[in-house]
A protein has these predicted regions:
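Conserved C-terminal structural/oligomerization subdomain of aldehyde/semialdehyde dehydrogenase
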Residues: 1-110
């Protein structure tokens, strides 16, 4: 089918039958996109297990939205960037590695 391989932006619910968890994960991951996956389960252990296996930038479980301070971003062709939270600000930072810096030295104001 095409619908599970496309990145759809809209109120669309796609339900595809499966026999095993492994098959469900394979169907969900068999796409070049990976913005958000949704997991519905009465078993917290199963939901956690599935969330770890899914290839998406964000996973929402049992209708719970992402928390405040969470980033927004995907994987694969859905992009690698992160917006929001500490991960979003890191896009604008330029790290510098300094070897042998002595933090015990008190520097005079210039």
């Amino acid at each position: 089918m095409t619908i599970e391989k496309e990145e759809i932006f809209g109120p669309v619910l796609c339900m595809i039958p499966f026999d095993t968890e492994e098959e469900a994960v394979a169907i969900a991951n068999d796409t070049p996109y990976g913005l958000t996956n949704y997991v519905q389960s009465g078993s917290p252990a199963r939901a956690n297990r599935l969330a770890r296996q899914l290839q998406a930038g964000m996973i929402e479980m049992n209708g719970k939205p992402r928390g405040a301070g969470s980033f927004f971003g995907g994987v694969k062709q859905s992009g690698r960037a992160r917006e929001g939270g500490i991960w979003g600000i890191e896009e604008f930072l330029e790290p510098k590695g300094i070897s042998g810096y002595d933090f015990s030295v008190k520097e005079a104001a210039e």
